[in-house]
């Protein structure tokens, strides 16, 4: 659901119907293919998580663009439409043995409506069996990164705050400032969104000083 194009979801995936691991069940007219609707209740937490993921995708047009990304700053925003990152910002470890990657979408290349730009989004994919740290690119002045999704919390996969407009995070949680190195647990995915700092906060003042210095980590 965070990839461009049509989401590759088959009926039942949203509530954990696995077909017992059979990836080619077209000829299985039996329990392998029959949807077990009891799983909706049994896996209600996962079902709710998928619903939030769908809502998040819908509210962020940068995640489903009609045209291919150029990876260039062709509008002079100071950021390309799409960029790749890793343990260092603006640099992807493309070695064949690497199992992690950071992807940043600049929401200014997409509109939520005629006037409002979409958000900056950073997606950290760690498919390795070990935890890794990702270096976060600096955001424009007056903004900070806030974690909105983590598939490896103590409670399991979570959205915070809920993407569909549910209860917002507490004021204390919203003020948590993620900077420089961002740890991602093994075999997990995290999503960060660029949020505006409150006027007069220390971060907002720091951001004004950094304006115009080009690409960097915070």
Question: Locations of the language-model features?
Answer:
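Carbohydrate-interacting/catalytic domains
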Residues: 1-9, 13-218
